[in-house]
Amino acid sequence: MTAIIDIVGREILDSRGNPTVEVDVVLEDGSMGRAAVPSGASTGAHEAVELRDGGARYLGKGVLKAVEAVNGELFEAIGGMEAENQIHIDQTMIELDGTPNKSRLGANAILGVSLAVAKAAADAAGLPLYRYVGGTKAHILPVPMMNIINGGAHADNPIDFQEFMILPVGAPTLREGVRWGSEIFHTLRKKLKDAGHNTNVGDEGGFAPNLKSAPVALDFIMESIEKAGFKPGEEIALGLDCAATEFFKDGNYVYEGEKKTRDPKAQAKYLAKLAADYPIVSIEDGLAEDDWEGWKYLTDLIGKKTQLVGDDLFVTNTARLRDGIRMGVANSILVKVNQIGSLTETLDAVETAHKAGYTAVMSHRSGETEDSTIADLAVATNCGQIKTGSLSRSDRMAKYNQLIRIEEELGKQARYAGKSVIKG
């Protein structure tokens, strides 16, 4: 009854107005799954490859080749298979592509089909996606890591770090955590406006003010937390995504906004000082993606008390993650479905992390759609943390709203991760 009888790929637009792939999978019993694929701005060199068309159309960013792969080769390969055989379906598509980074058919094509298959199978089983993927143990609502000030590749301002996040760790529920975040976000808007800064938002819905350095941004956030009536460190923790690969040049970290250059050890010490001066509990990509020595130094320096998340470092890839585990580098992995390109490999990455005592953070991309799959996957994997942007833009709100629905549906079984995500 769950045999795949039709697959339809199409080109739609993401939150930046760029093309992306959407896929519908239809089963023999009439069940259907639909998935839209996200896209990143600051992409790691080791990520699976999005297939783009090139040429003049959409300034080279069209995805008709990927759509053609969905409707052609991929449908021919998995048509007739049972949708609940997710691992077999994903493996078939990966082998059909035949490259180590999915560059022939495109990770955007393979992922679209992979996620749509899972959604169709969940529909056939009469289950929500989080329950279908995670089983009866899926019950933990993640702490949102809310990116309320944007910099780096996500904004047109001098701030070198890409994201400044608030984590409502002291909230009793996910729903309340979202409320706390919203109140701080709107308080920050007023503080920035009163200080003469613009309150335009970046790709992920956070503000992109013309601030010179990380401490200045952090001070604005700390003041906004207190003004909104919350206690920094106790109720609201802070997180950073440095996206350090973006400003790593010739072996050094070049801060254009601060007009400073730091070598890897100085970079690690700078991050350690920020973590000591502010209630920062999580730092993502504090060092560049191939600066393994710098990563090791940072991990030895503050890894016992601070979550150190590898995004560009690990790119949701179990092989790179295992390298990091073996070397004692970082202690957490950022999980982005389109970095690796299939649901099976995504779940493998989370499982590998958890088995090694590493945390996992489910994440959006800067180019998103109304698709809320990652909200379900965060609950399905009980990973306890999610990055899905700020408290504006409907492409970000779609994920928060889905989490609110899931928490309501779980009722008394629901547990908000809260302070359990904090190390040390």
Curated annotation (Swiss-Prot):
Q: Indicate whether Amino-acid biosynthesis appears among the record's keywords.
A: no
Q: In which pathway does it act?
A: Carbohydrate degradation; glycolysis; pyruvate from D-glyceraldehyde 3-phosphate: step 4/5
Gene transcribed to yield this protein: eno
| Catalytic activity of the protein | (2R)-2-phosphoglycerate = phosphoenolpyruvate + H2O
Family stated for the protein in its record: Belongs to the enolase family.
Which coenzymes or cofactors are required?
Mg(2+)
Q: What is the lineage of its organism?
A: Bacteria, Pseudomonadati, Pseudomonadota, Alphaproteobacteria, Hyphomicrobiales
**Coiled-coil parts of chain:** none
Identify the GO cellular component terms for this protein: cell surface; extracellular region; phosphopyruvate hydratase complex
Name used for this protein in its record: Enolase
An individual GO BP term = glycolytic process
How is its cofactor bound, per UniProt? Binds a second Mg(2+) ion via substrate during catalysis.
Question: What EC number is given for this enzyme?
Answer: 4.2.1.11
Residues annotated as binding Mg(2+) are 241, 284, 311
What species was this sequence derived from? Mesorhizobium japonicum (strain LMG 29417 / CECT 9101 / MAFF 303099) (Mesorhizobium loti (strain MAFF 303099))
User: Which keywords does this chain's UniProt record carry?
Assistant: Cytoplasm, Glycolysis, Lyase, Magnesium, Metal-binding, Secreted
EC top class, as a word: lyase
Q: Where does (2R)-2-phosphoglycerate bind?
A: 162, 336, 365-366, 387
